[in-house]
A protein has these predicted regions:
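Interfacial helix-cap and linker-helix signal at transmembrane-aqueous boundaries
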Residues: 39-40, 71-72, 104, 156-164, ...
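Structural signature of transmembrane alpha-helices in multi-pass secondary transporters
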Residues: 25, 54-57, 61, 88, ...
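Hydrophobic alpha-helical interface/terminus motif in multipass membrane transporters
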Residues: 36-39, 122-126, 160, 188, ...
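Hydrophobic transmembrane-helix bundles of small-molecule transporters
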Residues: 162-273, 280, 298, 306
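12-transmembrane solute porter fold
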Residues: 12-34, 47-57, 67-69, 202, ...
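Helix-boundary and loop/linker segments of multi-pass membrane transporters
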Residues: 3-11, 96, 196, 224, ...
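Helix-loop-helix hairpins in multi-pass membrane proteins, especially solute transporters
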Residues: 65-203, 355, 389
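Transmembrane-helix signature of multi-pass solute transporters
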Residues: 87-97, 114, 176-183, 210, ...
Length: 395
């Protein structure tokens, strides 16, 4: 009886641990951006130069995602999940202690590797733990964290930068990460999965070159220009690597990337659309926060507060969607309606000017959050709805 009190049902244990890990990972993606001016001042460089730390994180995260499924199948999902969370947590502490910009960039690379493994391995564990009919509930809980945490990042980061040291935007990850590690060690288990087979080295090299090239090109283009030689070389080089990678992966019996999964219509559609949707969601948070600080003179905390209404909108609609709308209408109408609303209110925010009051920006952010909250639940649930449990780690 005592053991039953201490240990939750397995699926709930997976949910708690994954949500905690996802929270610090997603929070970190936006909490750092509000501190870029403070980091530039600390290291006596421009904001553009400090952005190298963010670019390093993004590239490392992208490169570490493709091998996540193979590593999970080969060494066990619990082992890889806790190992990646430990790496992310330790790297967060090192980032907070960084004495130079070069050190910060190096430690952000380690952070990115850990972060890139957490989400695919953790989400596969979660959807294996929940039966198909309960996955909408699990997806709703994950959604609340995945969308609210980025909106909280600028608020929390702004408060930290204005009232403490920038180092705490990294140190804040450590206690949450440690708690998640302890609970994960107690509650998680290695799932059964398909045999890992041999590691696809050519696939890993090509996917790394492709992802690193494209992510790096997209990251630097706003500063140096889309036609800059470096942007073109990296971007086109990355696309060329993908052009070689795709037919190679389709020919192999045990590829690193199981591209055959994209034959499943829902998986293909929601993955491809979701890439652009989430990029736009995070991108506006970053741009708006920096604009309010550097062009309108608001403090980091004030700039971060403009993101709070969006978090409220997401929370309200994601919970309503989870309980009623998804059961009644299914994923397609919700996704189309929410996407239309998100596009409209994102477009409105593009025209924010020096005379636009903060309350109006906040109102549009709330409406954008309402739209986004309607989209992410059906997208998250439908992606894995027709994928066999044995293939979830590769999906």
């Amino acid at each position: 009886m005592a053991d039953r009190v201490r240990r939750p049902e397995y699926k709930h244990g997976v949910l708690v641990v994954y949500i905690a890990a996802l929270f610090v990972q997603v929070l970190d993606a936006t909490i750092v951006n509000v501190a870029l001016p403070a980091l530039a001042e600390e290291f006596a460089v421009s904001v553009t130069e400090v952005d190298a730390a963010a670019i390093a994180f993004s590239v490392a995260l992208a490169v570490s995602i493709p091998p996540a499924g193979w590593l999970s199948d080969r060494y066990g999902s619990k082992t890889i999940f806790l190992g990646s969370l430990a790496l992310f947590t330790a790297a967060s502490a090192l980032c907070g202690a960084a004495a130079t910009l070069d050190q910060l960039v190096a430690f952000r690379i380690l952070q990115g590797v850990g972060a890139g493994l957490i989400t695919p391995v953790g989400s596969a564990m979660l959807f294996r733990a929940f039966p198909l009919e309960e996955r909408a509930v699990a997806a709703n809980a994950v959604l609340s964290v995945a969308v609210i945490a980025p909106a909280m990042g600028p608020v929390v980061g702004g408060a930290i930068v204005d009232n403490a040291s920038w180092r705490w935007i990294f140190f804040i990850n450590v206690p949450i990460g440690v708690v998640a590690l302890v609970l994960g060690a107690l509650w998680l288990r290695n799932d059964e999965s398909a045999p890992a087979g041999r590691f696809d080295v050519p696939g890993f090299v090509l996917s790394s070159l492709g992802l690193a090239g494209v992510v790096f090109a997209v990251s630097i283009a706003p500063d140096v220009g889309w036609l800059d030689p470096l942007t073109l070389v990296c971007g086109l080089g990355g696309l060329a690597a993908f052009a070689v990678l795709v037919p190679l992966q389709l020919r192999l019996d045990n590829p690193l990337l199981h591209l055959g999964l994209f034959r499943e219509r829902l998986f293909r559609t929601f993955n491809l659309v979701g890439i652009f949707f989430y990029a736009g969601f995070i991108g506006l948070l970053i741009v708006l926060t920096l604009y309010l600080q550097t062009h309108r003179g608001y403090s980091a905390f004030e700039a971060g507060l403009t993101q709070a209404p969006q978090a409220v909108g997401v929370f309200l609609l994601s919970n309503l969607a989870g309980r009623r709308l998804y059961r009644r209408f299914g994923p397609r109408p919700m996704f189309i309606g929410g996407t239309f609303g998100a596009l409209v209110f994102t477009g409105v925010l593009v025209f924010v000017s020096a005379s636009t009051p903060l309350w109006l920006i906040g109102a549009f952010m709330f409406l954008r959050g309402v739209s986004v909250g309607t989209v992410f639940l059906p997208m998250q649930t439908a992606i894995y709805s027709n994928i066999a449990d044995a293939q979830l780690s590769r999906a």
